Design a protein with these regions (language model features):
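Pyridoxal 5′-phosphate
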Residues: 1-386
Length: 386
């Protein structure tokens, strides 16, 4: 759902909240004093995303803004009064993507949703079967926000280009967790948010490949070369750049320490009877688990864990007020009772071994207690350890 702000990024942003608070567009020294820190931060973003100097990285408030910019500008620039009227998304996109796509249906856009397999991913073959010369945009996430499953976005981008369509990926869960080199990819557009890789909330960006033109979503001043109006959040940009620099420098740590802790937690859950996890470990980003614990309502588990200081969710935090069954579980064809048992657990580099041990203990205790009072589950206390 989010991450704590990295202490180094926090310290770096503080001066721009207190002393160096100038507007970069101002001509006086308070404004010009922000130019070098901004350039340094942008250099870190280009390096962290593996982008070419010829590409654009436009600062936005978050990935949701970036995604809405892509979809609505594609409608105006590539669909309205043109021969193309189709948009393709996967069946497990974040609500920011699915809601933006659903909105455009009201204006005559044909929305095609790709099916997903039992691991919760759409494949390049799924895309080949439905894409056509009418397709304007394909949008498939890089890594799923609930399962952590990684999609083959490079291959899907090639398929989109064969039909003359643009390819966008919601890279929010991938940036800072796996190696990304966008200049070696055919991806046209990639959106991201800083708070997913230990940067501050309220800041993100949109990668735009050289030669791709998008009309602005926000009109006003000539900020970001006229592509995104609004006074720049200097403190946020500086912290985001530093956070991404740190995250990309620690990718090997992510893939060893965090993956080991994640696997320890996952293995402990799977030792309990009637439990499952969506997706193979090796096909997921290193920090995410979407588990199903039969006989235990996801919301009941959340409340039990929360009172013991453990933060978990039943799905996307951006839809956490909706207590319906988990949409990912529905998409992979899980039975309705199982879809209500989803439990999402995510780790960061700041988690410790003792915290994982504590989480295992509390999940086991909560499972035993909740199954014992379940009207739909045959509870056998001998099946549990601890």
């Amino acid at each position: 759902a989010t991450t704590m702000l990295d202490p180094q990024a926090y310290e770096l942003m503080l001066p721009f909240l207190k002393e160096n608070y100038g507007n970069p567009n101002s001509l006086h020294s308070f404004g010009s004093d922000t130019h070098k820190p901004l350039k340094d931060a942008m250099d870190k973003l280009y390096a962290g995303l593996g982008a070419s100097d010829l590409d654009d990285i436009i600062i936005t408030s978050c990935a949701t803004e970036s995604i809405n910019w892509v979809f609505k500008s594609v409608y105006f620039d590539y669909i309205l009064n043109k021969d193309r009227n189709e948009i393709i998304i996967s069946g497990v996109e974040h609500p920011a993507v699915s809601a933006a796509a659903n909105f455009l249906e009201k204006f005559g856009v044909k929305l095609i949703t790709l099916p997903v397999n039992n691991d919760g991913i759409s494949t390049p073959q799924n895309l080949k079967e439905v894409i056509s010369d009418k397709t304007a945009l394909v949008s498939v996430m890089w890594a799923n926000n609930e399962t952590g499953m990684i999609f083959n976005v490079d291959e899907m981008a090639k398929i989109a280009h064969e039909k003359g369509a643009l390819f966008h990926t919601d890279a929010t869960q991938a940036v800072g967790k796996i190696k990304i080199i966008l200049k070696q990819s055919e991806i046209d557009l990639a959106s991201f948010s800083a708070h997913k890789f230990h940067g501050p909330k309220g800041i993100g960006g949109l990668f735009i490949k050289k030669g791709i033109n998008l009309s602005p979503l926000l009109h006003g001043g000539e900020h970001m070369a006229g592509r995104r109006s609004g006074t720049l959040n200097v403190a946020g940009i500086v912290a985001m750049g530093e956070a991404l620099k740190i995250a990309t420098s620690m990718l090997n740590f992510e893939d060893s320490h965090i993956r080991r802790l994640r696997d320890k937690l996952e293995d402990a859950i799977l030792k309990m009877p009637d439990t499952s996890v969506v997706g193979k470990k090796e096909d997921r980003i290193p920090n995410t688990i979407l588990a199903s614990i039969k006989g235990v309502e996801g919301e009941a588990m959340l409340w039990d864990l929360n009172k013991n200081g453990i933060a978990a969710s039943t799905g996307s935090a951006c839809a956490s007020e909706d207590l319906e069954s988990n949409p990912i579980m529905n998409a992979i064809g899980a039975e309705n009772d199982l879809a209500h048992t989803a439990l999402r657990l995510s780790l960061s580099r700041f988690n410790t071994e003792s915290e994982i041990d504590y989480a295992i203990e509390e999940i086991n205790k909560a499972t035993k207690r909740l199954r014992a009072i379940s009207s739909t589950y045959a509870y056998n206390p001998n099946n549990y350890k601890g």
